[in-house]
C-alpha cells in the first residue's frame, strides 16, 4: 500500500473522502489481525495501515480545528510545474521540487538503522512530507491502545521492525495513558504469553523494559498463564513481589534471568532477614514476616531451572596446590584435600534441602554430579569394615529427612538416586552411649531436611536413577543477531547472584527439622521405602548395620500405630529383625522390638515366625511370653496366652501329637500374671526402660514355685533347660576350649595322614602282588610250552622209528602186505619207543609174542601219566582264572547284578545333573562298559529313556549302544557302549586335530574326505533320530563320543522327554543351554522343533573344522551373541567358503530359514567330483535355455558388484555385513566372508594364459570364442576343459613340456581341482542363486537323478 493522492474539489467532498479512507483502513487492519497465517509482510501492511489511519486522522482533526488551512490539506493535490525544479500548489504558490527520496514511504523508517526519532530527523530533515508523517504518528500514538493491533505485534516481536518501532517510539509507549497504564502494560500480556525461547530480540526487549519502565510496571508483567502455585506459594510470591522473574525461571532462560534479577536486586537491597511464619486465619493461610528479600530457590527447583542453577547458584571449588600435582596427590592420600571450603559444603547441603523439598530430580542430579568427588562420596573399597552407627565414616553426608504426605515411589526413587551415585546418608549418633542410658543420647546436628508432598506433581526420581540424561550447558549462550544493528549494547552478565550466604542460610533456617529419619520412615509403614533407605546407608550391602540404628522406641511407634495393617507391620518387623540381628540385644533370643501392647501384632508375628516350616529354628514361645509379661496388663496377657494356645493347638501333626502342647501348659495364666514371682530388675517406666540391657533380664525363679510346678507336671520337664541358656563363657574357658579344639583338629589331621599312608602302602603291596602273579603266570606258560614241544618231538621220533621197524619187518616177511587195521590198532605213544629200544632185533616168533604182555602193562601206565599231566594243566588254568576273578573283584569293589565297577574318583567318567554319574566298569566279568547310575527320585522318566535306548540299539552305528540294565533300591544302572572319549575331551587334551587327521597322508583331499566322513556320519545319526520322531536337543562336543575312529551320539532324546540327566564324559556338567549350542528359541523357552538340532550341528561342524572354535565366540559371551545373532566365521571362511555358507544357513536366527538335514546332505560341501561336473553342465544348459533367458546371471552379478567394496570383483551379497575381524565385536552384527562370494573379472586373468590360449584357439581344430567378462562363458570354458583335458594335455606338452599346468590336466579330477582353486566361490554362488528361484530349482535341468541337488 502506498500513499494515495486524493483529488477533491470541494470541502464537503474532501471530508467525505477522509471518513471513507479511515473506515477502509480500519477494515484492512481488522482483516489482517484476523489472519491466522500472519507473516512479516502482513505485519508491514498492518503498520502501513496504522500510519495511513494516523495520517487521515491528522487531516480530519486539522480541518475541524482550522478550516482555513487548506494548504496543508492540499499537499496531495499538487500539480507539477513544467518549469525547472519548482511546482505550484492549488493556490498558485511556488515550491521547490523534492527529489526521489522526498517521496519515501512512511514504512521505510523501519528498514534503516535509526534507533531514535532524533536519528531519523537528522537523516530525513530535508524531506518535509516524511518528517510530518512521523510527527503525526507520535501525536496520534493513542491509537496503539487497540488490543488487536498489539496482538499482532506480540506475535511477531522477533522481527527487526518491531524492535525498531520500540526504539523510535519508546518515550510515547511508556508514558501513562488515560487509564493510568502505559501501552507497555498491554503489550506485556501478549509478549509473555507468546515468548518461550531466549533470543536476541527477547533480551533487547527486556533491556528496553528495564531501562524505561518503573518497578511497579515490571511487577505486573507476565503474571497470568505462567504457572499454577499452591496457596502457600501464592502468598510467598505475592509478598516478595517477584512475579517478573517467574518467566525466566519457567523456561530456564539464563541471560533473561540475569537481566531481571540484577534490576530487582538493585531495587531491593538486602536487609536483615527474619523468619517466615505461616498461620491459618478464617480458613486461609497468611504470612507474617518483615523480610523483603527475594526467595528464588524454591522456584528454581519448582521449575527445574538446571542451567540457571548451575550458572548462578553452585559454588566454585577451591583447589589446593593446583600447580603442584605431586603435593596435591599427597594431600588427597592423607585425607587433607578438600575441593570445597566449609562454607561451600554447608551451602551444598542446603541445596539438597531446597531441591528435595520441591522434588526436583534434575537439580538434585546436578548437585550429585557436581559434588560427588568432594562431598557425600564414600570410598567403599577401603572402608568395608565400617559399621554405620559406630564412628562416622569420612565424606559421608549427614542428613535428616522428614516425610510428610509422602508419595512412596518418589521417596524410593530418591534413595535409589543417591545410592546409584554413591552418596551415603548417615543418620548416626556422634557419641555412642551405653544402651540403657538412652536419656543422654544426643543426635547429630541436622544439616538438611527433606519434605515430600503429593500436592506438587513434579517429575519422578526414577528416570534419573540409572541413566541421567540432563544436559547442562554452562557456556555462554551464543545467539545470532537477526538484524543488522551493530550498535546494540552487550548485555551485562551478572554471576553468582544466588550465592549470597545470607539468602541461602535464611531459606534453610525457615524450616526447622521435624524429626529424625528412621522414625519418619517407620511412620510411613512402607517396607519398600525402608529397603531403599537400608540399601543406601549400607552402600549396596558393603557395610554392616549397627544394632543402634533402630532404637526400641522408634520400633515401638511402629507397632503402636493403629493405621497400618497388621500384615504390613509384621513384614517390616521381620525385615528389621533380619537385617539388624536384634536378637543379639536381648536375652535368650527375644527381640525387644516386639515389646508392645498390640497383642494382635504379637500373635501375628508369632504365627509368622513359628509356623510348622520354621518351628525348629525359631524362638520358643516361652521366651516371647516371658518378655511380654512385665509390660502388659493381666487382661492382655490372658488374651495373648489364649491366642498362643490356639496357635499351637490349631493343627495336629501327622503322628497325632501336638507340638509344644505340653510346653504351653506350663504357662498357666495365674503363674504368668504373678509378676512378683519373677526376680527381675525394676524398670523406670515404659518409655525409658524400653532400651533393654541384656544383663537386666537375668533372673531366677522362686524355688517353691518351681517345685510345685514340677510336682504338678507329670512329665517332669526340666524348666531350667527351658528357661535358661548357657551363660557366656569367660575368657579362660574360651581359651581352653580353643586349645582343645586345636588339639582335636591336629589329632584328626594326623589320623587322616596315617590312613592315607596306610592306603598308599596297601595299594603298593597290591601292585607288587599283581606283578609277582603276572611273572608266575608267564613262567607257567613257558613251562607248558616246553612240555608241549617235548611231547611233539617224542611223537615224531616214535613215528619215524615205527616206519623203520615196519620196513624191516616187511623185508623179513618177504613182501607180504600189512593190513591197514594192524597199523591203526597200534598205540602211538611215546613209551613204545622206549620199549622197542630195550628190545633189540625183534622177531615174530612165539617167544617174542609172549614178551608182549608186559609191554601192554607199560603202555597203560604211560597213559595214566599223560592224563595226570593234562589234569595238572587244567588245574593251573582254573587257578589262573580264579586269580583273574579275584583281581577283578579287588579292582571293581561294587557289584550290581552283572555290573562291576569302582566308585573312586579316578574311575568316574562323567557327571550329570540330579546326581547322575558315569563309571568305568565291566559286564559279565569280561566286557568293558560305561555304567550310568541315575537316581530314581530325580529321574522319573528313566524307563522311557531305557525304552528308547533299547529300540535304537544296533540300528545305527552312529548312536550309543545299550547293553544291559540293573537296579537297586535307590538307583538304576544302564550299561552303555564304552567309548574312547568325547570331542570335548579330545579338544581339552589338544588331540582333536590328531584324531581328525589320523590314518591320512599329507594330501589335503584325504584329510578333507576324513572330516566330511565324520560329519556325514554324525548327521546321519541325527537324521535317524528325527525319523524316529526324536529331537535330541542337547548336541554339543560333550555328547559326541569317539569309538573306533567314528563319532557316536549319546544322550538320545533325553531333552525331548524332559529328562534332566546327561551322559557326558566330562568332570564338569554344564546345564542345558549354557554351553552355547542351543538356538535362541531354546534359550527363550519356546517350542522346540527339529531345527534345534540343525543349529547345534552347525556349531559342531564349525567346532570340528576349526579345531575347537565356536561361531559365537568364547563361552562367556555365547548366549548374549546367540540372542543377538552375532556370529564370526572368519576362522573357517579363509579355508573353506563352501562350508562357511552351509554353517551360516544352519545357525540362522530364524528357525524357519534353517535347512532340513536331508537338504544339508545335498549341499555342495558334500558333493563328489561327478556331481560338481554334472551341476556345471546343468547350469550351462539352464543359462542357454530360451525359457530362462529372462534370468540374466550376469545382470545379477553386476548388481552384486555395485554392493561390493571392491570394483574389480563380482560379489554375491546375500548378507550385507562382512568383516575380516577374527573376533565378534559389538559394532558388527555378523562376521562371515561367506556373505560376499567374488568372481574376479575378467576371469581369464585368474587362469594360466597357456590354458586359455590353447582352449580358445584349438579344440578339435575349431576356434572357440569367449567373453571374459561373462560368467556364462567361464562355465562353458570349464566344461570344455573337463571334456577335452586329454587333448589339451597333449597339445600343451608338445609346446611347453615343462609347464606347471600339465600337472592339473592329467585327469578330470585334477582339472576340476585346478578350477576350484582358482574360483572357490563359483559353485556356491550358482547354487545359492538357483536354489532361491523355484522355476529354476524345479526345472528339468536339475530333476534327473545325477543332479538332484535341491
Curated annotation (Swiss-Prot):
ATP binds at residues 909-917, 932. InterPro entries: IRE1/2-like (IPR045133), KEN_dom (IPR010513), KEN_sf (IPR038357), Kinase-like_dom_sf (IPR011009), Prot_kinase_dom (IPR000719). Residues 731-802 form a coiled coil. Residues 903-1166 form the Protein kinase domain. Residues 772-795, 824-864 have a biased composition (Low complexity). Its main location: membrane. It comes from the Eukaryota. The keyword Transferase applies. SUPFAM superfamilies: Protein kinase-like (PK-like). Residues 809-823 have a biased composition (Polar residues). GO terms for molecular function: ATP binding; protein serine kinase activity; protein serine/threonine kinase activity; RNA endonuclease activity; unfolded protein binding. Keywords: ATP-binding, Coiled coil, Glycoprotein, Kinase, Membrane, Nucleotide-binding, Serine/threonine-protein kinase, Transferase, Transmembrane, Transmembrane helix. Residues 761-771 have a biased composition (Basic residues). It catalyses: L-seryl-[protein] + ATP = O-phospho-L-seryl-[protein] + ADP + H(+); L-threonyl-[protein] + ATP = O-phospho-L-threonyl-[protein] + ADP + H(+). It is found in: Membrane. It holds the Pfam family Ribonuc_2-5A. The active site is at 1034 (proton acceptor). Glycans are attached at residue 37. GO terms for cellular component: IRE1-TRAF2-ASK1 complex. Residues 1169-1346 form the KEN domain. CDD domains: RNase_Ire1_like. One of its GO terms (biological process) is IRE1-mediated unfolded protein response. Residues 761-795, 807-864 are annotated as: Disordered. It is a single-pass membrane protein. It is an enzyme of class 2 (transferase). This is Probable serine/threonine-protein kinase irlE. The gene is irlE.
Amino acid at each position: 500500500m502506498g500513499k494515495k493522492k486524493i483529488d477533491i474539489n470541494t470541502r464537503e467532498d474532501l471530508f467525505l473522502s477522509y471518513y471513507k479512507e479511515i473506515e477502509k483502513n480500519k477494515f484492512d487492519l481488522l482483516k489482517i489481525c484476523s489472519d491466522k497465517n500472519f507473516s512479516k509482510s502482513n505485519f508491514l501492511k498492518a503498520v502501513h495501515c496504522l500510519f495511513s489511519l494516523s495520517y487521515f486522522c491528522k487531516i480530519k482533526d486539522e480541518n475541524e480545528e482550522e478550516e482555513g488551512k487548506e494548504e496543508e490539506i492540499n499537499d496531495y493535490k499538487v500539480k507539477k510545474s513544467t518549469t525547472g525544479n519548482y511546482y505550484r500548489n492549488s493556490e498558485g504558490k511556488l515550491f521547490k521540487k523534492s527529489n526521489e527520496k522526498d517521496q519515501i514511504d512512511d514504512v521505510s523508517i523501519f528498514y534503516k538503522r535509526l534507533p531514535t526519532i532524533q536519528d531519523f530527523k537528522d537523516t530525513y530533515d530535508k524531506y518535509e512530507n516524511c518528517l510530518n508523517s512521523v510527527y503525526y504518528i507520535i501525536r496520534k500514538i493513542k491509537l496503539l491502545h487497540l488490543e488487536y493491533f498489539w496482538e499482532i505485534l506480540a506475535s511477531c516481536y522477533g522481527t527487526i521492525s518491531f524492535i525498531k518501532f520500540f526504539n523510535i517510539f519508546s518515550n510515547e509507549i511508556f508514558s501513562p495513558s488515560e487509564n493510568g497504564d502505559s501501552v507497555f502494560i498491554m503489550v506485556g500480556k501478549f509478549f509473555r504469553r507468546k515468548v518461550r525461547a531466549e533470543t536476541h530480540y527477547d533480551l533487547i526487549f527486556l533491556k528496553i523494559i528495564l531501562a524505561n519502565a518503573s518497578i511497579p510496571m515490571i511487577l505486573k508483567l507476565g503474571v497470568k498463564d505462567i504457572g499454577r502455585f499452591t496457596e502457600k506459594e501464592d502468598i510467598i510470591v505475592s509478598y516478595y513481589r517477584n512475579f517478573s522473574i517467574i518467566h525466566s525461571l519457567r523456561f530456564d532462560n539464563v541471560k533473561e534471568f540475569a537481566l531481571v534479577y540484577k534490576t530487582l536486586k538493585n531495587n531491593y537491597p538486602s536487609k536483615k532477614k527474619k523468619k517466615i511464619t505461616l498461620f491459618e486465619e478464617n480458613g486461609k493461610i497468611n504470612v507474617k514476616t518483615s523480610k523483603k528479600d527475594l526467595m528464588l530457590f524454591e522456584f528454581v527447583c519448582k521449575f527445574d531451572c538446571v542451567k540457571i542453577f548451575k550458572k548462578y547458584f553452585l559454588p566454585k571449588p577451591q583447589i589446593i596446590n593446583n600447580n603442584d600435582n605431586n603435593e596435591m596427590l599427597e594431600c588427597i592420600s592423607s585425607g587433607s584435600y578438600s575441593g570445597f571450603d566449609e562454607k561451600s559444603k554447608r551451602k551444598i547441603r542446603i541445596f539438597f534441602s531446597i531441591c528435595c523439598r520441591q522434588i526436583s530430580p534434575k537439580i538434585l542430579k546436578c548437585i550429585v554430579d557436581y559434588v560427588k568427588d568432594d562431598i557425600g562420596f564414600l570410598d567403599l573399597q577401603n572402608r568395608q569394615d565400617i559399621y554405620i552407627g559406630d564412628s562416622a565414616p569420612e565424606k559421608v553426608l549427614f542428613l535428616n529427612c522428614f516425610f510428610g504426605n509422602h508419595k512412596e515411589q518418589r521417596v524410593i526413587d530418591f534413595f535409589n538416586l543417591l545410592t546409584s551415585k554413591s552418596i551415603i546418608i548417615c543418620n548416626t549418633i556422634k557419641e555412642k552411649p551405653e544402651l540403657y542410658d538412652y536419656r543422654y543420647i544426643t543426635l547429630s546436628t541436622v544439616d538438611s531436611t527433606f519434605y515430600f508432598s503429593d500436592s506438587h506433581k513434579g517429575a519422578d526420581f526414577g528416570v534419573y536413577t540409572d541413566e541421567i540424561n540432563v544436559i547442562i550447558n554452562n557456556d555462554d549462550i551464543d545467539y545470532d543477531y537477526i538484524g543488522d544493528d551493530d550498535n546494540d549494547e552487550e548485555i551485562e552478565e551478572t554471576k553468582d547472584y544466588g550465592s549470597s550466604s545470607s539468602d541461602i542460610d535464611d531459606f534453610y533456617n525457615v524450616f526447622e527439622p521435624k524429626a529424625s529419619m528412621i522414625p519418619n520412615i517407620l511412620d510411613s509403614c512402607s517396607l519398600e521405602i525402608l529397603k531403599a533407605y537400608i540399601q543406601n546407608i549400607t552402600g549396596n550391602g558393603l557395610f554392616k548395620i549397627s544394632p543402634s540404628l533402630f532404637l526400641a522406641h522408634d520400633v515401638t511407634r511402629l507397632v503402636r500405630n493403629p493405621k497400618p495393617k497388621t500384615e504390613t507391620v509384621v513384614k517390616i518387623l521381620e525385615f528389621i529383625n533380619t537385617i539388624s540381628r536384634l536378637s543379639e540385644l536381648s536375652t535368650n533370643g527375644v527381640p525387644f522390638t516386639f515389646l508392645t501392647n498390640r497383642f494382635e501384632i504379637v500373635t501375628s508375628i508369632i504365627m509368622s515366625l513359628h509356623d510348622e516350616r520354621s518351628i525348629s529354628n525359631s524362638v520358643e514361645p516361652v521366651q516371647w511370653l516371658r518378655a511380654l509379661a512385665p509390660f502388659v496388663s493381666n487382661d492382655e496377657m490372658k488374651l495373648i496366652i489364649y491366642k498362643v494356645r490356639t496357635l499351637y493347638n490349631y493343627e495336629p501333626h501327622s503322628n497325632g501329637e501336638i507340638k509344644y502342647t505340653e510346653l504351653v501348659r506350663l504357662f498357666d495364666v495365674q503363674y504368668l500374671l504373678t509378676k512378683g514371682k519373677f526376680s527381675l530388675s525394676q524398670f523406670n517406666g515404659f518409655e525409658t526402660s524400653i532400651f533393654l540391657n541384656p544383663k537386666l533380664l537375668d533372673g531366677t525363679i522362686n524355688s517353691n514355685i518351681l517345685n510345685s510346678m514340677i510336682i504338678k507336671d507329670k512329665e517332669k520337664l526340666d524348666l531350667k533347660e527351658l528357661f535358661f541358656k548357657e551363660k557366656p563363657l569367660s575368657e579362660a574357658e574360651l581359651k581352653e576350649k580353643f586349645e582343645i579344639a586345636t588339639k582335636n583338629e591336629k589329632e584328626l589331621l594326623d589320623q587322616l595322614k596315617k590312613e592315607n599312608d596306610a592306603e598308599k602302602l596297601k595299594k603298593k603291596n597290591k601292585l607288587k602282588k599283581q606283578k609277582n602273579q603276572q611273572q608266575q603266570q608267564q613262567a607257567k606258560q613257558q613251562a607248558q610250552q616246553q612240555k608241549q614241544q617235548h611231547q611233539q618231538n617224542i611223537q615224531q621220533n616214535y613215528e619215524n622209528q615205527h616206519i623203520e621197524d615196519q620196513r624191516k619187518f616187511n623185508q623179513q616177511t618177504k613182501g607180504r602186505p600189512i593190513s591197514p587195521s594192524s597199523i591203526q590198532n597200534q598205540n602211538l605213544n611215546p613209551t613204545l619207543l622206549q620199549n622197542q629200544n630195550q628190545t633189540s632185533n625183534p622177531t615174530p616168533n612165539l617167544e617174542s609174542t609172549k614178551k608182549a604182555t608186559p609191554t601192554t602193562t607199560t603202555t597203560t601206565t604211560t597213559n595214566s601219566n599223560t592224563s595226570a599231566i593234562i589234569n595238572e594243566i587244567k588245574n593251573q588254568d582254573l587257578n589262573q582264572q580264579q586269580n583273574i576273578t579275584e583281581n577283578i573283584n579287588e579292582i571293581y569293589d561294587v557289584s550290581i547284578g552283572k555290573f562291576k565297577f569302582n566308585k573312586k574318583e579316578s574311575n568316574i567318567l562323567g557327571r550329570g545333573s540330579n546326581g547322575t554319574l558315569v563309571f568305568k566298569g565291566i559286564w559279565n566279568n569280561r566286557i568293558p562298559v560305561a555304567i550310568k547310575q541315575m537316581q530314581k527320585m530325580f529321574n522319573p522318566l528313566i524307563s522311557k529313556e531305557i525304552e528308547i535306548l533299547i529300540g535304537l540299539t544296533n540300528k545305527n552305528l552312529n548312536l550309543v549302544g545299550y547293553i544291559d540294565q540293573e537296579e537297586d533300591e535307590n538307583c538304576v544302572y544302564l550299561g552303555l557302549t564304552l567309548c574312547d572319549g568325547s570331542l570335548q575331551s579330545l579338544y581339552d587334551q589338544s588331540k582333536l586335530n590328531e584324531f581328525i587327521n589320523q590314518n591320512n597322508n599329507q594330501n589335503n583331499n584325504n584329510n578333507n574326505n576324513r572330516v566330511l566322513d565324520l560329519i556325514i556320519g554324525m548327521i546321519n545319526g541325527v537324521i535317524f533320530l528325527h525319523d524316529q520322531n526324536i529331537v535330541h536337543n542337547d548336541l554339543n562336543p560333550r555328547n559326541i563320543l569317539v569309538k573306533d575312529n567314528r563319532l557316536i551320539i549319546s544322550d538320545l532324546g533325553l531333552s525331548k522327554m524332559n529328562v534332566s540327566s546327561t551322559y557326558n564324559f566330562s568332570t564338569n556338567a554344564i546345564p542345558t543351554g549354557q554351553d552355547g549350542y542351543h538356538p535362541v528359541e531354546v534359550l527363550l523357552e519356546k517350542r522346540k522343533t527339529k531345527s534345534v538340532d540343525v543349529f547345534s550341528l552347525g556349531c559342531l561342524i564349525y567346532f570340528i573344522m576349526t579345531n575347537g572354535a565356536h561361531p559365537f565366540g568364547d563361552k562367556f559371551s555365547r548366549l548374549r551373541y546367540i540372542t543377538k545373532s552375532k556370529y564370526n566365521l572368519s576362522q573357517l571362511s579363509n579355508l573353506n567358503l563352501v562350508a562357511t555358507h552351509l554353517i551360516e544357513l544352519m545357525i540362522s536366527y530364524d528357525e524357519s530359514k534353517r535347512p532340513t538335514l536331508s537338504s544339508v546332505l545335498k549341499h555342495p560341501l558334500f558333493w563328489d567330483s561327478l556331481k560338481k561336473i554334472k551341476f556345471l553342465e546343468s547350469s550351462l544348459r539352464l543359462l542357454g535355455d530360451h525359457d530362462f533367458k529372462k534370468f540374466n546371471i550376469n545382470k545379477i552379478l553386476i548388481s552384486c558388484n555395485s554392493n561390493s567394496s571392491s570394483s574389480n570383483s563380482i560379489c554375491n551379497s546375500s548378507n550385507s555385513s562382512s568383516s575380516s575381524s577374527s573376533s565378534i565385536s559389538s559394532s558388527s552384527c555378523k562376521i562371515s566372508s561367506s556373505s560376499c562370494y567374488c568372481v574376479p573379472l575378467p576371469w581369464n586373468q585368474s587362469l594360466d594364459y597357456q590354458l586359455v590360449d590353447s582352449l580358445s584357439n584349438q579344440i578339435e581344430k575349431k576356434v572357440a570364442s569367449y567373453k571374459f567378462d561373462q560368467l556364462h562363458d567361464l562355465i562353458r570354458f570349464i566344461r570344455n576343459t573337463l571334456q577335452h583335458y586329454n587333448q589339451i594335455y597333449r597339445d600343451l606338452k608338445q609346446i611347453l613340456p615343462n609347464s606347471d599346468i600339465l600337472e592339473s590336466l592329467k585327469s578330470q579330477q585334477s582339472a576340476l581341482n585346478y578350477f576350484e582353486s582358482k574360483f572357490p566361490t563359483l559353485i556356491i554362488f550358482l547354487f545359492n542363486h538357483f536354489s532361491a528361484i523355484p522355476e529354476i530349482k524345479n526345472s528339468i535341468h536339475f530333476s534327473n537323478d545325477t543332479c538332484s541337488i535341491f
